[in-house]
């Protein structure tokens, strides 16, 4: 089975892919926010193209574990994605995923300017890998 990780940023949605064989998430692409309908259609196309069985949406909890506006948005988006596609959608705590993604990319030698186009997909990979690790622990 394949899995798609999603990092819902303010301007972009990062996507990452993994499967049961390798159990290693890798950055896939970035979707620039347009409208909710266009975003859902783009993600639905990716789910079909890669024959994804489960999507994992990052849940941006506050550091104390409480939910704010961003977490409520992620929950609503996940529910809408599941309804629109019929693909099961799970939520996963994404605290510090962007920080970890930026650190990984800097270690690989990317400049601050180059991070902008890559960090969302890398953060989606961090989220998906965390979910996979927890699932297979």
Swiss-Prot record:
Its main location: cytoplasm. Belongs to the YqgF nuclease family. NCBIfam families: RNAse_H_YqgF. It comes from Anaeromyxobacter sp. (strain Fw109-5). One of its GO terms (cellular component) is cytosol. It comes from the Bacteria. GO terms for biological process: rRNA 5'-end processing. This is Putative pre-16S rRNA nuclease.
